[in-house]
From Swiss-Prot:
Signal peptide span: 1-23
Keyword terms of this UniProt record: Glycoprotein, Membrane, Signal, Transmembrane, Transmembrane helix
Gene name of the record: APRL7
Primary location class: membrane
Localisation per UniProt entry: Membrane
Name of the protein in its database record: 5'-adenylylsulfate reductase-like 7
């Protein structure tokens, strides 16, 4: 029964707009145009979310030159070889849906010359640059979604049309957190094979830190050497001289003892010779008598 009622109502509405007269057709068209204009005012086409556009250096310059109005353009400079850059890419896609008023462009490092990055003041990746006709604002801060939304709101004065959560996978391939890798049981060798550029970057940072620390440590060690080592040297030399003097004294005592023994031995030998001589003289005198 409900099905027949629905069919009857649809037929009645369609019959009201049949070309029984040109006036009825004009009324239907006019009502449709009014309805469409109201819908477009509430949901203009410019607010429909669109994904970020991947461009190279030449196309980026052309789009920037063609931006004569006060429209904002957000540009993500990143490299696909770095896990930290790959982690920012999904967040940038979310931002393009939350802020459809803003044109979002993506520039990959291999698609642009180094002069393009220098022209826009990009010296590290990933970097997000907000541009309009009068200003260029580079984002400095954490790369989480809440901080990026706050940067968009403060820079452009616009509010997001919807709030979205970061529904990004946190696997080893997409998450660039070294601590997470180590926590999940990956060895240093596996990380080096998977991300050699990150290992080289860490080695470079360690070398730079060592270059900064070693001169300071060297100056401190020199100061400690100048303050304490001379006193230690004098004390060691004094003790050494005392030990050397005692050793010499012991050597002199030993020499005296040897001389004394030699003297006693000589005296004993002389006395023995004298005794033998007196005995031999006594025997010779008795024989002559």
């Amino acid at each position: 029964m409900n099905l027949w009622v629905s069919i009857f109502l649809v037929s009645a509405i369609a019959g009201s707009c049949l070309p029984s007269g040109f006036a009825y057709v004009d009324v239907c068209n006019h009502e449709f145009e009014v309805f469409r204009s109201v819908i477009e005012q509430k949901c203009p086409r410019s607010l429909y979310p669109s994904p970020p556009i991947e461009v190279d250096g030449d196309l980026l310059d052309k789009l920037m030159d063609a931006n004569h109005g006060n429209a904002y353009i957000s540009i993500l400079f990143y490299t696909s070889r770095c896990p930290f850059s790959r982690a920012v890419r999904p967040k940038f896609d979310v931002l393009s849906s939350m802020f459809p008023h803003i044109t979002h462009l993506i520039v990959e490092q291999s698609q642009a010359l180094p002069s393009v990055f220098s022209r826009y003041g990009i010296h590290s990746l990933p970097s997000i640059l907000m541009v309009n006709q009068t200003m260029k604002m580079r984002y400095h801060g954490p790369k989480d979604l809440a901080s990026l939304i706050q940067f968009y709101k403060e820079t452009t004065g616009l509010k997001p049309v919807q709030y979205m959560d970061e529904g990004e996978p946190t696997s080893l391939d997409t998450d660039g957190n070294l601590i997470t890798w180590l926590h999940n049981g990956s060895s240093i060798r596996e990380i080096a094979e998977r991300e050699p550029y990150m290992v080289l970057a860490l080695m470079f940072l360690s070398l730079k830190l060592a270059i900064l620390i070693f001169p300071i440590m060297g100056s401190r060690l020199k100061t400690l050497w100048a303050l304490y080592v001379p006193h230690l040297s004098l004390g060691i030399l004094g003790e050494t001289s005392q030990l050397f003097g005692r050793a010499l004294h012991m050597i002199d005592v030993r020499r005296l003892w040897i001389k004394l023994r030699l003297t006693k031995t000589r005296n004993f030998q002389e006395r023995a010779k004298n005794a033998l001589a007196s005995v031999s003289l006594g025997k010779s005198s008795s024989q002559s008598a």
